Amino acid sequence: MKRIEVNVSRVIPASPAEVFEVWLDTKSPGGPWFGCERVILHAVVDGLFYHSGRHQGRVWAHYGRFVRLERPRLIEHTWMSEATRGIESTVTVTLEPKGQDTLLTLCHSDLPDDDLGRQHEEGWKFITGAIADRFGSRRRAG
């Protein structure tokens, strides 16, 4: 099966350290694990994660293993779900300072080249948007 790569970039109004912490905190509003029905996350190299959440009227389970954690600039983990056809893919998140903000760049590689694989782009745009909104509301209030 042919593979594709999805890339999403977004400027987040927070420091790389703040974004890194939110990415790995299951209880942090705006983070990728927040609001899931069930989350198990052991955020260390070779640590595993599982999360399930509702989307389009059904539950989707996701599994993976943390490959690299370089605080506060890089998070890399594998990603497997029904939407990857059970094949392990890789998510790499880089966090670069951009003035007082952070440029978050996400690369999701080895996705199947089909509708489910391509839908990951919209999912990651939603998640990175939620993180930006979380910090954007804080900055507006502060």
Predicted regions and their residues:
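Hydrophobic ligand-binding cavity/cleft-lining segments
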Residues: 1-38
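N-terminal short leaders/motifs
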Residues: 1-6, 17-21, 44-59
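Residues that scaffold the ATP/ADP-binding catalytic core of kinase and kinase-like folds
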Residues: 22, 32, 52, 78, ...
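Residues at helix-coil transition
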Residues: 24-25, 71, 136-137
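Hydrophobic-ligand binding "helix-grip"
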Residues: 31, 39-44, 50, 55-99, ...
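A conserved amphipathic terminal alpha-helix motif
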Residues: 109-142
